[in-house]
Amino acid sequence: MLKLIGSVMVFGSCAALGLSARQNLRRRVTAADAMLLALGLIRSEISGRRTPMPEIVGLLTENEQPIVRKVFRTLQRRLREQNGLSLGYLWRSTLRDCRAQVGRGTQECDILCDAANYLGRYDADEQLTGLSQVERRLAASREAAQEDLANRGNLYRTCGIALGLLVILVLI
């Protein structure tokens, strides 16, 4: 009886590891999609209404995407609390601090941090050009993450289940 219970627990934990690895890949794609939408909103606000960055951050705190809300609420709080620091510094530190919580990969985080070089610094056209470059790079990174999910996601799940079955066969 103990062997059976132990076998079920080992199988469950190995399968959970495989499924967790697949879920992390899926979260990376979802986070990239959400941040692409946020960058699109920032770009449209800068080009259309010439809205200042603190107001844009306020708009994004009410976004329906939980990833966007989390990042920009943290940024808005930091803007209020640490108003002596530049927007670029706060943007970078917020994105790096929230990276693991919202499921972004290191590559996506670095790409988004590059937007700090443009936001709030230059005239609207320079900001839009910089944001377009960041969006293109993030879209390419998102496609790579989607490809990883398609190629490796099922592999991780299957390997987790197979490892669980292998351990059970060895134990029994």
Task: Please place each PLM-identified region on the residue numbering.
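Interfacial alpha-helical end/capping and short helix-turn segments at domain and membrane boundaries
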Residues: 68-99
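Bilayer-spanning, highly hydrophobic alpha-helical transmembrane segments
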Residues: 6-17, 143-172
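Short, non-transmembrane cytosolic segments of multipass membrane proteins
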Residues: 94-125
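Membrane-interface, cytosolic juxtamembrane amphipathic helix immediately N-terminal to a transmembrane helix
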Residues: 27, 33, 114-161
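Juxtamembrane/interface alpha-helical elements of multi-pass membrane proteins
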Residues: 3-80
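Amphipathic alpha-helices that form helix-helix packing interfaces
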Residues: 38, 42, 68, 75, ...
